[in-house]
Amino acid sequence: MVHVRRHETRKNSKTQKPEQKSRVDWHRTKRSISQLFDSDEELDSNEELDSDEEHDSGESIDSDEELDISKKSDINELPEKETELKLIKVESQGSNSKHLTNTSNSSADEEQLKETKHNDLPDDEAHPGQAENHHNRHTGQILEEDMEDEYIKPGKRKRLSSVMYDSDESDDSDILIRKASAKHPRRVVEDECSSLEMEQETPEKSSAARKREYHQKLQELSERSRQRRRRNSGRNFEDSEKDSCSGTGEEDEDEDEDDYRYDEDGDDYMIDDFVVRNEEGDDENSNQQGENLTTSQLKLVKQNSLYSFSDHYTHFERVVKALLINAFDESFLETLYAGTRKKSYAKDMLTSLHYLDNRFIQPRLESLVSRSRWKEQYKERVESYSNLNILSKSPENCVCQACGLHRHCKFSVHLSGKLYNIRTMETDDFMSHDKQVFTVGRICVERTRIYHKLKHFKFKLYQDCCLIAKPEEVGDEQVKDTVKRVFNHSKERGWIRKKYDQLQNFLNSADYFQDEKF
């Protein structure tokens, strides 16, 4: 072994011999060392490319760290080898025998170096003969190219350096190394996670925002219901609507004042019917609103005579009761049709009266007239006179005064009676003794009989009620009690049922009346 002290003593000796040229080829040694560095860098770059395509970010960065460590070890080995070569050069100035031993040691070191190269380098660099041939062909340019290649970094290494730079900026190196390697896929996953978090946050809105939305929706709903009520109130049921509006006007105003509450800013908003305080109250409010709509619809149905859930006999009983009340109090029907009476029984009576006129009688009258050729003058005469008397006479071929056709006429129609109001049943004494006589045929006389009975059925029924009420009138008894007593007595006797059956016969006769044959 060569020691440093021996080196210093030999260098400071008095007798110095001229330096002999070393047998070591320094150009070859430098080329081999530079070739070693280049091969290491190429090998590391190839390994990095494979590792980046196949492995994740952690493995790629670990390989970079191992590459840096191997570089540092190679650089550290370089000065040691140079010191050994310097020792060989100094010892060559001594005896030839010692110089030969040093050169032999250096040759042994070179053999060991070649063996390590053979194990570490790929197959093309394990054979020094091929490498020498390659470098001999480029002897003039190889040193400069090697020096330049030492400072050139491949593109892949630049990407890795940027990744390491991004990872150095973070606080937690382990998490960021994983994050930096799988760039695009990890970002997509993170975006999905963030979108899921946003979707989870969307249903978790603040209570104020939800109340605002509910408030806006319910305000729109209330406005629609108001418009619907306005449209319904402006239809063809003016009389019934006047009753309901005038009777419940003050109550509705009080309810509206209770339903509305004012906030600090003075804005009015509805509380009791529309504002939802929590999510569980949605179903309750919707059910309450549905009930309110159904009750309002039922109210309109009751007020409308075209829609009723009562049977025909119930309507007829109410009509009889109304006529009995009017027999004791002649102003009852007038006030009932005027809408001044607000009680429920009065409204039911008004509905039944409309039902009798508009559903029972009027359609049959229109059907009888539409299937005939009656003159308008004859029709008006039949409607104006309440009394009808049909007499037979000697037949004659003449023109029928009802239809204007040439017929075999053998009947004379006598019309008489006072004119009356079809609603209030008040009579008019103007020309009370006037009479009208018409000569008609067989078919027209039958049509006249059915038409007159249906047209004046309610007036005839009122006259019968007046005949029943007069003997039952008591001075001290109230009208309500008297009407109740007379009505129950008439119902027990079967008089109401008898009049109802009579009406049904008239209706059936009008329905099955044969058409006039020409």
UniProtKB/Swiss-Prot annotation:
InterPro entries for this protein: CCDC82, DUF4211
Record's compositionally biased regions (Basic and acidic residues): 16-27, 68-89, 111-127, 215-225
Keyword Coiled coil on entry: yes
Residues with PTM Phosphothreonine: 202
Coiled coil: 204-232
Residue ranges with Acidic residues bias: 38-67, 191-201, 249-266
Compositionally biased spans, kind Basic residues: 1-14
Bias (Polar residues) ranges: 92-107
Keyword terms, alphabetized: Coiled coil, Phosphoprotein
Region listing for Disordered, in residue ranges: 1-266
Record-listed Phosphoserine modification sites: 170, 194, 305
Database matches in PANTHER family: COILED-COIL DOMAIN-CONTAINING PROTEIN 82, PHORBOL-ESTER_DAG-TYPE DOMAIN-CONTAINING PROTEIN
The protein, known as: Coiled-coil domain-containing protein 82
Biological classification of the source: Eukaryota, Metazoa, Chordata, Craniata, Vertebrata
Gene encoding the protein: Ccdc82
